[in-house]
């Protein structure tokens, strides 16, 4: 009497899921290769339907490779697996990660650099103020969702609803404000506090951090925004006393009421210095 023992064929189940939520994913194009690089099987993942491969060789190493990731995901690194000698179903899981957004704002403004005396003849004094562009610190922004920011798996709860506040950022000593690890999507930014001496930029700015492709792990928005400095305009209307008759030929002088300094704290114009002067001055306080 001779007994023949029959080996059961190996069975492997392969699933594709979201690394964070564990939800199984549709649309991933996958390939299994043997150790020589030959294609053993190819298919497209279907949600809640693990792909089954039978009769792989026990003890041989195989490679599960993602050729195309589902929309909204990054392509996963290869997964290597070896089949054991068992009739039980062996499971292999490949997890996909989602890209994240990085918002970087470089805030600039004009700073007084130097003052040049243009003319000093025939009683006339005039100065030229020259400015340089530099970084603005302590400028604060609120970041909002410009649309419903949805989870890539299509099942999990939305990250943010339209117009929901995402967070607040403030520029550092280098004029940089940034927010990272944002879910892919569209946002807008509002300036809520600006640096001393500058005009608040009240217009919302829109930022597109939408999904790019399966090979871009960080979607970056990096832009320079500039604030206008506050400016002063002086207009003098000379009238005759007790009447509204406008008088021509009035002569005025404009003086500093405090030391004028540059961004480094260096005094460029001392207090009570004439900025604009044509003969007899009438002092104006600004």
Please identify what each model-predicted range represents.
Residues 1-279, 283-285:
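Solvent-exposed loop/turn and edge beta-strand elements of beta-rich ligand-binding domains
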């Amino acid at each position: 009497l001779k007994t023949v023992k029959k080996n059961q064929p190996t069975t492997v189940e392969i699933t594709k899921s979201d690394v964070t939520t564990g939800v199984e994913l549709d649309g991933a194009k996958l390939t299994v290769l043997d150790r020589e690089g030959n294609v053993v099987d190819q298919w497209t993942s279907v949600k809640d339907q693990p792909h089954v491969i039978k009769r792989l060789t026990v003890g041989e190493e195989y490679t599960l490779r993602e050729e195309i990731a589902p929309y909204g995901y990054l392509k996963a690194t290869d997964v290597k697996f070896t089949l054991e000698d068992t009739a039980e179903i062996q499971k292999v899981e490949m997890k996909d990660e989602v890209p994240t957004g990085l918002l970087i704002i470089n805030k600039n403004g004009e700073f007084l650099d130097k003052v040049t005396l243009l003319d000093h003849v025939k009683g006339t004094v005039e100065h030229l103020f020259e400015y340089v562009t530099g970084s603005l610190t302590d400028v604060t922004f609120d970041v909002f969702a410009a649309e419903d920011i949805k989870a890539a798996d299509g099942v999990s709860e939305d990250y943010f609803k339209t117009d929901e506040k995402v967070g607040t950022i403030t520029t550092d000593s280098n004029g940089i404000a940034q927010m990272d690890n944002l879910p892919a999507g569209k946002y807008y930014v509002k300036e809520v506090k600006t640096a001393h001496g500058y005009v608040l930029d009240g217009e919302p700015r829109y930022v597109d951090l939408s999904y790019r492709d399966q090979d871009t792990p960080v979607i970056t928005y990096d832009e320079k925004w500039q604030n206008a400095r506050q400016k002063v305009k002086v207009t003098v209307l000379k009238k005759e006393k007790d009447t509204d008759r406008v008088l021509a030929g009035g002569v005025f002088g404009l003086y500093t009421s405090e030391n004028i300094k540059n961004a480094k704290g260096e005094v460029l114009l001392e207090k009570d210095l004439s900025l604009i002067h044509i003969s007899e001055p009438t002092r104006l306080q600004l």
